Regions:
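Active-site-proximal beta-alpha loop/turn segments in soluble metabolic enzymes
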Residues: 9-13, 45-50, 101, 133-142
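Active-site catalytic microenvironments in core metabolic enzymes, especially phosphate/sugar-handling
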Residues: 102-108, 130-139, 169-175
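Active-site histidine-anchored catalytic micro-motif
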Residues: 17-24, 32-119
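Short acidic (Asp/Glu) and glycine-rich catalytic loops that position anionic groups and cofactors
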Residues: 92-96, 132-136, 180
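N-terminal glycine-rich anion-binding loop in soluble enzyme alpha/beta folds
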Residues: 1-30
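Core alpha/beta catalytic barrel or barrel-like domain that forms the active/cofactor pocket
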Residues: 42-45, 129, 177
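Hard-cation-handling environments
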Residues: 141-180
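Internal, active-site/partner-interface "lid" segment
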Residues: 120-148
Length: 180
């Protein structure tokens, strides 16, 4: 296990191009400085946007995948993250937060790490990542995960995760402040 990079920020609009370029290049330099990488785990929020890059996480995944090749690549992600084509193409599986308000970050990271270990052990073979986009808008007060339709959708995803062949499932609502 080789920790490579950690960055954190609050909501604040698009990241300046120079700052985003530096962040991505520093992260990729650290990954590229390692050889014989067996697998990768990323803890992402998923709703970052830059002044000149709408999909920073996808760009990071492209760079990591280019370096590590065909090794298991697992992520955990906030349910406010935006699932892009680049993200789906670059990742093997994603474990999503299942709570809003967010109280399951530790458990989500644990699920992702366990799934990565199962991929490395050969217990999970050839995972497939997909996305179904549902044309809907929901008010914030309807997104509490303990109750209501959103909570029912989360519980359906948890059922998928524990079913035979299920690895990870989630409902992502995106981020209303990231207009991409």
């Amino acid at each position: 296990i080789v920790p490579t990079y950690s960055a954190r920020s609050g909501t604040g609009g698009p990241v300046a191009t120079a700052d985003l370029d530096r962040l991505i290049s520093e992260l990729l330099e650290r990954v590229e400085s390692e050889s014989n990488i067996d697998g990768v785990y990323l803890s992402l929020h998923g709703a970052m946007a830059g002044e000149s890059e709408d999909d920073p996480e996808g760009k990071v995944l492209e760079g990591i995948r280019r370096h590590v090749g065909d090794v298991p690549l697992m992520a955990s992600m906030d349910l406010h993250g935006i699932i892009t084509d680049k993200l789906i193409e670059g990742i093997d599986a994603i474990s999503f937060l299942h709570t809003y308000p967010h109280i399951d970050a530790y458990e989500t990271g644990e699920r992702a790490a366990i799934n990565l270990l199962k991929m490395l052990d050969g217990e999970i073979k050839n995972p497939t990542t997909g996305r179904v986009q549902i044309p809907m808008l929901a008010r914030g007060n309807e997104l509490i995960t303990r109750t209501g339709k959103f909570g029912e959708a989360i519980r359906a995803c948890q059922s998928i995760e524990t079913s035979e062949g299920g690895i990870a499932a989630g409902v992502n609502i995106g981020n209303p402040f990231t207009d991409v």
